[in-house]
């Protein structure tokens, strides 16, 4: 299983790289679950990351404003991100989510056909009025995305598994694979929960808190030794 680690700055990115992460995912935790960082942080992270290692960028827990979101996606793309992650926070339906993701995909793929577009929903969408998480694979497929993802919108100590059963998560993974896409799962995932994701054939696991000191995504800092421990679990 591939490990995606989410640094907030270049110093943390180096720790993630040295720890053996597969994907370096630039985000800005104070701005939310998939908080967007600044273009220059994405650019600096891309420059610091070895050639051949993929860099991802979250572009925010986005509203239903397709034009605004598409511009943000383009900004992340030209700043050097290989993966463009869109948090479908303010989309209330399949149609709204599709509207956002179709336009994002169009903009990103115009820059580079090999760029990877990620449609991210939330396992706890019921808490924020977001689109049903089980709709995300269909949204991703119909919009021409490459990855369907789930995270958690509210970071209050509850994990992905507090909001969706392993059976529902397996259904999400299987539907995503049926459509020929990769599946990514995140959401305050603890290291001891990773084997469950492997069992349901998840392709990519995303972490920040688990790789940070004190397990704190906001106040903690990513440390390479913690990343190494997670890598070991992902690869064994």
UniProtKB/Swiss-Prot annotation:
Q: In which pathway does it act?
A: Cofactor biosynthesis; methanofuran biosynthesis
Task: Write down the superkingdom of origin.
Answer: Archaea
In this record, what's one Pfam family? 4HFCP_synth
Q: Name one GO molecular function term.
A: carbon-carbon lyase activity
- Catalytic reaction(s) noted: 2 D-glyceraldehyde 3-phosphate = 4-(hydroxymethyl)-2-furancarboxaldehyde phosphate + phosphate + 2 H2O
Task: Give the EC number(s) listed in the UniProt record.
Answer: 4.2.3.153
Instruction: Report keywords, A-Z.
Output: Lyase, Schiff base
- Where along the chain is the active site annotated? 27 (schiff-base intermediate with substrate), 85 (proton acceptor)
Q: Which InterPro entries match?
A: 4HFCP_synth, 4HFCP_synth_arc, RibuloseP-bd_barrel
Its Gene Ontology biological processes?
methanofuran biosynthetic process
What protein family is recorded?
A: Belongs to the MfnB family.
Q: What does this protein do?
A: Catalyzes the formation of 4-(hydroxymethyl)-2-furancarboxaldehyde phosphate (4-HFC-P) from two molecules of glyceraldehyde-3-P (GA-3-P).
User: What's the name of the protein?
Assistant: (5-formylfuran-3-yl)methyl phosphate synthase
Classification of source organism = Archaea, Methanobacteriati, Methanobacteriota, Methanomada group, Methanococci
């Amino acid at each position: 299983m591939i490990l995606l680690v989410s640094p907030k700055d270049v110093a943390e990115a180096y720790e993630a790289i040295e720890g053996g992460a597969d994907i370096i995912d630039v985000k800005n935790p104070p701005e939310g679950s998939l908080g967007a960082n600044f273009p220059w942080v994405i650019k600096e992270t891309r420059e610091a990351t070895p050639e051949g290692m993929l860099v991802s960028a979250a572009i925010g827990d986005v509203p239903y404003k397709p034009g605004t979101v598409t511009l943000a996606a383009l900004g992340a793309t030209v700043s050097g991100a290989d993966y463009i992650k869109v948090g479908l926070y303010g989309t209330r339906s399949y149609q709204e989510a599709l509207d956002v993701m179709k336009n994002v995909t169009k903009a990103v793929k115009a820059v580079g056909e090999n760029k990877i577009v990620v449609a991210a929903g939330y396992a706890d969408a019921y808490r924020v009025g977001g689109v049903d998480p089980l709709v995300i694979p269909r949204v991703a497929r119909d919009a021409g995305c490459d990855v369907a993802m789930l995270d958690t919108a509210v970071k209050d100590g509850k994990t992905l598994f507090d909001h969706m059963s392993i059976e529902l998560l397996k259904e999400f993974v299987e539907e995503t694979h049926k459509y020929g896409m990769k599946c990514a799962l995140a959401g305050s995932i603890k290291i001891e929960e990773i084997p469950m994701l492997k069992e349901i054939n998840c392709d990519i696991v995303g972490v920040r808190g688990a790789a940070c000191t004190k397990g704190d995504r906001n106040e903690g800092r990513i440390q390479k030794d913690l990343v190494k421990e997670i890598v070991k679990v992902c690869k064994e």
